[in-house]
């Protein structure tokens, strides 16, 4: 299969963000990979549109990734989200009352976006890179408990791992898979019921 790398500079972390971009460029040159890159002032965009920085960053990032996908002629956008990311997202959805869909977690394929690393914990990916002599960048903002996700990552999940279940991230994601099957079944039942009740004039609520 063909690969094209894409890097988006959110202009949030100053010099550290520029170092990340330079790292990606060097990596792509080393491995002869095509790179498309772009940067945008996420804080300014967030302020102009009354969005949280996290929401603004996601919007601009995925808008860019879709443009990059089309420009490069690629079929899909592959992100590096892993099992630990998924567990955090599931817990965030749980505490926000997102319902069944949110508790299902990230899907391996959602439209043109794929998540090929969802089966791997972060520590497994780091170990793989170290064993193969590959360098990597670390986002220092991940270690500051100033967001809900960072609070989960730095304090809540470690407490659960230490006091209840050291494999809690895997358990959370395994439960999400089971809930995903439940959701598929319920959606199928609902669709069948709708088709059975559908009439030329609308829906027969007695069926």
Please report, for each region that a protein language model flagged, where it lies by residue:
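Core alpha/beta nucleotide-donor-binding catalytic domains of modification enzymes
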Residues: 1-157
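ATP/NTP-dependent adenylation/nucleotidyl-transfer catalytic domains that generate, transfer
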Residues: 147-207
């Amino acid at each position: 299969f063909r690969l094209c790398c894409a890097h988006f500079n959110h202009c949030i972390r100053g010099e550290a963000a520029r170092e990340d971009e330079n790292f990606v460029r060097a990596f792509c040159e080393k491995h002869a990979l095509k790179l498309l890159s772009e940067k945008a002032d996420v804080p300014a965009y967030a302020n102009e549109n009354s969005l949280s920085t996290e929401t603004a960053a996601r919007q601009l990032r995925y808008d860019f990734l879709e443009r990059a996908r089309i420009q490069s002629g690629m079929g899909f956008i592959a992100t590096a989200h892993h099992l630990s990311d998924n567990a955090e997202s599931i817990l965030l959805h749980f505490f926000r009352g997102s319902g069944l869909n949110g508790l299902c977690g990230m899907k391996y394929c959602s439209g043109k976006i794929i998540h090929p690393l969802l089966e791997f914990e972060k520590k497994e990916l780091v170990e793989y890179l170290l064993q193969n002599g590959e360098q990597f960048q670390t986002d220092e903002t991940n270690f500051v408990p100033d967001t809900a996700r960072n609070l989960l990552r730095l304090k809540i999940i470690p407490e659960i791992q230490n006091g209840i279940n050291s494999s809690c991230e895997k358990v959370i994601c395994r439960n999400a898979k089971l809930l995903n099957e439940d959701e598929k079944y319920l959606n199928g039942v609902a669709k069948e019921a709708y088709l059975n009740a559908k009439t030329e004039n609308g829906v027969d609520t007695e069926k």
